[in-house]
Amino acid sequence: MELENKFKKVTLGHEEGSGAPCLKCKEKCEGFELHFWRKICRNCKCGQEEHSVLSNNEDDRKVGKLFEDTKYTALIAKLKTDGIPTYKRNVMILTSPVAAKKDVSINTVTYEWAPPVQNQALARRYMELIPKDKQPVAGSEGAQYRKKQLAKQLPAHDQDPSKCHELSPNEVKQMEQFVKKYKNEVLGVGDVKLPKEVEAQASGAGRSTNGSLSTLTTVKSTDDKVAAQKGSTYYCFRCKENMREGDPAVYAERAGYDKLWHPSCFVCFTCNELLVDMIYFWKNGKLYCGRHYCDSEKPRCAGCDELIFSNEYTQAEGLNWHLKHFCCFDCDIVLAGEIYVMVNDKAVCKPCYVKNHAVSCQGCHNAIDPEVQRVSYNGFHWHAAPECFICSCCSKCLIGQKFMPIEGMVFCSVECKKKMSS
């Protein structure tokens, strides 16, 4: 029975989102079909985040799992039906009257996520301070951006061994220890407050811990004219620009009360993207998203996108791979000891390269083998052979000679060109 249940779980995982359209390829993709171990669509090779696969419920369960057994349990609730922790995502609905010809209608704007603060005006101002195309208004480009970042920054397979492919018992144990460690030591959620409120909070924290008063990040010169004009003496830890009076700031408890960020500056040190839902990982004085924090701690397989907990793995093309996952991107044959070609940063075996990616020779019209020398000019290609790279008129070999290219044809002289034109 247990084996049967495990099998069902795997099957359902691959059925989830099946047939969902690709937002990138549009009608070129037949619909989402999850590759057995890669985190991509088998039809178009795009990632899950490029398809309309994950629902808000699935995202909420993933984030809920992340916050389980942390100091952020107030942000989750466990469903009575299955006991799975679910993220209590704060949704903000703003209404405003719109004057019409006869009567007044109500305009409603729903944010799929907003900072969990009691002061809605503060949350609204926070949204105004991040780029418009990243504001998670329901049905907008910003809402889609948030979904993509949830998938990219917080992959489920970075926290849940059951989402990984064929881990050994020892690898599962190592992963569980790794996840427990980052939950206890580096995981955090940003908080939106006015700097003066943070200062008051810092004062209380400073006195309660060691009797000394923590100081907020302030401008170095007390008579700074710019600061005086803007009415604030607080500056952003990232950009060093001044905070405007009355604007909210983001702070990270792991970083300490002496550091504040503009809402648009609360970004990952590596990818420079807004930290989705202000979820951060603090390491060596820098903010990271979940993905790039994990990348700084463990090698990541370029094939399955999972962290590598095995002592044995391979390195190729500057990337790390599980031994069983260094495979052809097209046919999945293992490439160890085989000839392969890199196509758009993906390793492809020689047969697949010749079949799917090789350019054709303008002379013989056959595919050009990747190990064979070629001549390329302006998007046209020839075998570097005396029977292929020849004058289109007199068949003179042009290897090492001057030539005149005309729409895929090459000529040895003006005379030959004129003969072909007449």
Curated annotation (Swiss-Prot):
GO terms for biological process: neural crest cell migration. It is found in: Cytoplasm, Cell cortex; Cell junction, Focal adhesion. Residues 92-199 form the PET domain. Keywords: Cell junction, Cytoplasm, Developmental protein, LIM domain, Metal-binding, Repeat, Zinc. It holds the Pfam family LIM. Residues 135-165 are annotated as: Disordered. The keyword Endoplasmic reticulum does not apply. The keyword Transcription does not apply. InterPro entries: LIM1_Testin, LIM2_Testin, LIM3_Testin, PET_domain, PET_testin, Pk/Esn/Tes, Znf_LIM. SUPFAM superfamilies: Glucocorticoid receptor-like (DNA-binding domain) (SSF57716). This is Testin. It comes from Xenopus laevis (African clawed frog). The gene is tes.
